[in-house]
Amino acid sequence: MIKVQREAEPAVLNLTDSDSIGFKELEAAKKTTFTKDTKFPFEAYKDESVKNLLKKMFNGKCGYCESIINVTSYEEIEHFRPKKAINIEGIQGLTYPGYYWLAMSWNNLLISCQRCNRSHKKNYFPIENESNRAKAPGEESGEEVLLLNPCEDDPSEHLEFKDTGIIEFKEGSKKGEKSIKVYALHRRELTEERAKVAKDIELKKVQILDGLSTLKVLLRYQEDSDLQKEIEKTVSNIISLYDFIFEYENDPNRPYQAMVTQITSDFLSERKELINKLKTTSNRKNSCEQSHISS
């Protein structure tokens, strides 16, 4: 999970516009009593413009697990606060009503994969004290929410990843602990997918270190013209590997970016100056060769 900047709401969910679908739906919902048997047509959030904007915001990834959403796992518009009913720990069945007045609220909408939404998050929305549970519009501010919202929280302050793909909550983080459980961010198949990415990144880190060690030896004999090509090849490979990791860490379109950032940031920063020197030297040499060819 990574922090995501929420964009301005699409026109259909402009709740200050009395002509918008969202506004009309909200007014109708306020006049409805929600029970198990209530059939209310929540439709505003299903508008194609809403889904498209959410997909763009989250770069085609699940807002919870950061997996790429593809044809084998369709995206679903997720209500952070459940719209119709709530699963409350310790209470059997669903509790009514849910946060019906937020069903068409842009700030309550995220996008998720089916696994996170249907199999795990479902209608759960744990808070610190049930007596503070909002039952009417405007009462949400009194809740101490126990789940991470990628558009409101910085997940990196609550979640910690290992280079094996394992996720843990940071000490003292109730939100981190509860989010891992409710979103099932520790589920086996998800951990295995993160592990594949982590293994590839860790391999590249080892290759960079090996390359730097090799380069150190080669540079002792840099006057030997027969070794120049080997030196150039080694430098090029080191730079390529470093850039791959750097670009992955900074590309929000990549899956499990949060994990990659955590397991690579120190490694990259500690070698940034050295890599820049190698790039400068390599570019200068290439420039000289081009000038020689041109002349």
Swiss-Prot record:
It comes from the Bacteria. GO terms for biological process: defense response to virus. Disruption phenotype: When this gene is missing the Septu type II system does not confer resistance to SpBeta in B.subtilis. InterPro entries: HNH78-like, HNH_nuc. Keywords: Antiviral defense, Hydrolase, Nuclease. CDD domains: HNHc. GO terms for molecular function: nuclease activity. Component of antiviral defense system Septu type II, composed of PtuA and PtuB. Expression of Septu type II in B.subtilis (strain BEST7003) confers resistance to phages SBSphiC and SpBeta. May be a nuclease. This is Septu protein PtuB.
